[in-house]
């Protein structure tokens, strides 16, 4: 009887140790779209402004924000937070004023470092070279900074609310997204420009990619991958009855 109890005792100890080792040990087990727990610091009220206060992080890496009774939720963040490469995207910009846009909607780059938090260069990223004789784009696209995005689809296909503004060093920074989309699905009557309409059906369509952006879900704010428009491409299909 004594030996049976001893074996049962050791069995329970081994089962406990196995269960302990199987438990998550760090924040790395959280979903990819959420930052580490030290990414969003606790906020404080300053200069009489009402700023939301961060609650402890949940097990899924989300950050709960408790409004202080004001209607407008003002999220405060540390400027050094944006220096983390994993949260940086060349298509996402936090700025106190609209980014400059050159003629035909082409971006001329980020604002100066005193105004813009993103240091990734985007100088004329979407500017096309001067077209010589006989050189034309298959599809016409338009690029612009979008600063009024309120909702978006995340990487899981769920609709989320995009965080419009954040408070950094008592300055309100707006979240902008650099998007590219088709100007016209059919730049010519037959579809895409330069395509043999005798053998092919064609049309221009906008394609998407996912970028990390600050979003809100209820009273929780976190980084998530959201879908934005990034290019205009030509879609081809062979006409039926032709080899």
Swiss-Prot record:
Propeptide stretch(es), residue numbers: 23-125
InterPro entries in UniProt: Cystine-knot_cytokine (IPR029034), Nerve_growth_factor-like (IPR020408), Nerve_growth_factor-rel (IPR002072), Nerve_growth_factor_bsu (IPR020425), Nerve_growth_factor_CS (IPR019846)
Keyword Disulfide bond among UniProt keywords: yes
Segments of skewed composition (Polar residues): 40-49
Localization annotation: Secreted
GO molecular function: growth factor activity; nerve growth factor receptor binding
Leader sequence residues: 1-22
Pfam families found in the cross-reference section: NGF
Region (Disordered): 26-50
Cystine bridges: 139-204, 182-232, 192-234
Keywords: Cleavage on pair of basic residues, Disulfide bond, Growth factor, Secreted, Signal
GO biological process: cell surface receptor protein tyrosine kinase signaling pathway; modulation of chemical synaptic transmission; negative regulation of neuron apoptotic process; nerve development; nerve growth factor signaling pathway; neuron projection morphogenesis
GO CC field: axon; dendrite; extracellular space; synaptic vesicle
Subunit details: Homodimer.
Family named by the database record: Belongs to the NGF-beta family.
Function per UniProt: Nerve growth factor is important for the development and maintenance of the sympathetic and sensory nervous systems. Extracellular ligand for the NTRK1 and NGFR receptors, activates cellular signaling cascades through those receptor tyrosine kinase to regulate neuronal proliferation, differentiation and survival.
Protein name: Beta-nerve growth factor
Record organism: Gallus gallus (Chicken)
Phylogenetic placement of the source organism: Eukaryota, Metazoa, Chordata, Craniata, Vertebrata
